[in-house]
């Protein structure tokens, strides 16, 4: 591996931060630079320009080495998430340049312009880390794993602040559940934490261990007046010293009286009055008109049915009358013809 790769690494370190370049601590960045030197440069930059390019790289390295550092702006450490974010951004832009197949002086210009922009981008990542993620605990002792950019080593850093994280006043009604929460927002991100221990503190400066374990809350069901008083929560660490201490002052309030709601089937006087008043309200004109139309429709239907029934009944009576009249005349004539015959028969016999 020639001196070109070493100078590229130095240029990258200088361009990305005004100190030792943290992104060079990422193995994927080192592999990408090796590929750039061995695979891309030979076919995209004439040999006669290699020397001039490397002189510019060397000058860039010197310029960044001479920058004065502001300790408040950059502390030379980052966490794993910040390093990964900066490395991914750099590799993405480097791949964009190599995929474009740019050559010659244009390649050199784009490479150094990309390094300049990546320096600004990574600086914003570092500033955000130092403001939001570096030692975020406002109290207690947090153990945070950091990466030292000077030697790319990971070490556990102790963010030491006051052990005392204050006192909390808790009010709970009698016969309700008491819940004491000892967890702080940075506990999950800290390393080297052990168990939560809850103590009952008595007036004679003595205390009794109530519970110990991984649970960050202490729950006591159906508290009584005897549960009022002082409690203390202590979170342990691997350093044999507490990470946080929180004090609780518990006040047990009188038992809450719950109002009994009446059954839905029982009508109270107020409800009866309301219902009666609602029933006595006059109907709206639209409802009155609809009810009248419905009544007229029903009456008309009944009258029509009655008329049809009566007409059918009358028709049947007329038909029966006609039939009876016709049959009645025929039987009378037959009787008249039969009488003379009988008389004739009698006269013959005589």
Swiss-Prot record:
Izumo is the name of a Japanese shrine to marriage. N-glycosylated. Glycosylation is not essential for fusion and for proper protein trafficking in sperm. Phosphorylated. The cytoplasmic C-terminus is phosphorylated and undergoes phosphorylation changes during epididymal transit. Belongs to the Izumo family. The chain crosses the membrane at residues 293-313. It is a single-pass type I membrane protein. It is found in: Cell membrane; Cytoplasmic vesicle, Secretory vesicle, Acrosome membrane. Essential sperm cell-surface protein required for fertilization by acting as a ligand for IZUMO1R/JUNO receptor on egg. The IZUMO1:IZUMO1R/JUNO interaction is a necessary adhesion event between sperm and egg that is required for fertilization but is not sufficient for cell fusion. The ligand-receptor interaction probably does not act as a membrane 'fusogen'. Acts a ligand for the human-specific oolemma epitope FCRL3/MAIA during fertilization. FCRL3/MAIA replaces IZUMO1R/JUNO as IZUMO1 receptor after sperm-egg adhesion, which permits species-specific gamete fusion. The modification Phosphoserine is found at residue 325. Residues 1-21 form the signal peptide. Residues 167-251 form the Ig-like C2-type domain. The extracellular domain assumes a distinct boomerang shape when not bound to IZUMO1R/JUNO. Interaction with IZUMO1R/JUNO triggers a conformation change, so that the IZUMO1 extracellular domain assumes an upright conformation. The cytoplasmic C-terminus region is not essential for fertilization. It is however required for protein stability. This is Izumo sperm-egg fusion protein 1. Its main location: membrane. Keywords: Cell membrane, Cytoplasmic vesicle, Disulfide bond, Fertilization, Glycoprotein, Immunoglobulin domain, Membrane, Phosphoprotein, Signal, Transmembrane, Transmembrane helix. Glycans are attached at residue 204. One of its GO terms (molecular function) is identical protein binding. The lineage of its organism: Eukaryota, Metazoa, Chordata, Craniata, Vertebrata. Sperm-specific (at protein level). Detectable on sperm surface only after the acrosome reaction. Disulfide bonds join 22-149, 25-152, 135-159, 139-165, 182-233. Residues 314-350 are cytoplasmic. One of its GO terms (cellular component) is acrosomal membrane. Residues 148-160 are annotated as: Important for interaction with IZUMO1R.
